[in-house]
Regions:
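Local sequence-structure signature of Cys/Sec-based thiol-disulfide redox active-site neighborhoods
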Residues: 16-57
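Short, glycine/charged-enriched secondary-structure capping and boundary segments
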Residues: 45-48, 76-78, 109-111
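Hydrophobic residues at beta-strand termini and immediately following loops
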Residues: 5, 63, 105
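N-terminal leader/targeting and pre-domain segments
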Residues: 1-29, 93, 117-120
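Non-catalytic, surface beta->alpha helical segment in thiol-disulfide oxidoreductase systems
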Residues: 85-120
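A short acidic, often aromatic-flanked loop/helix-cap motif at beta-alpha or helix-coil junctions
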Residues: 10-12, 67-73, 111-114
Length: 120
């Protein structure tokens, strides 16, 4: 499953300091926080369907926060949350969860590295 994060999910992460357990439950999940213009994100986005096929039970979420038209959340506020809470100013930024627990993070990574960090 690959899908975009909602404004409510992003606001909840800002409130709680991480993404809700319901999003990351299951064997593996990845949350990608990025901006639409990033060439490395374009590369990653192109291989996500292959990752989804290989990782049948994985949950893959993303948000391109620079182009979101959120009602109650400013794009810059979400970027500041990502940079300050997760101490990462680079994009794309990826958080990996195994069995519902945060396991590690990365920035751009190859398809094989992405699959490996999700347990394959």
């Amino acid at each position: 499953m690959i899908r975009k994060l909602t404004e409510a999910e992003c606001r909840a992460a800002m409130k709680n300091g991480d993404f809700e357990a319901a999003l990351v439950q299951g064997p593996s999940a990845a949350i990608i926080l990025t901006q639409s213009w990033c060439p490395q994100w374009t590369s990653m986005k192109s291989y996500l369907p292959k990752a989804e096929e290989a990782l049948k039970d994985a949950r893959i979420y993303y948000v391109e926060y620079d182009i979101e038209n959120w009602e109650k959340l400013e794009n810059e506020a979400f970027m500041a949350f990502k940079e300050n809470t997760f101490n990462n100013r680079e994009i794309p930024y990826v958080r990996y969860y195994l069995n519902g627990v945060f396991s590690r993070d990365s920035n751009y990574i190859s398809l094989e590295g992405f699959k490996s960090r999700l347990g394959l």
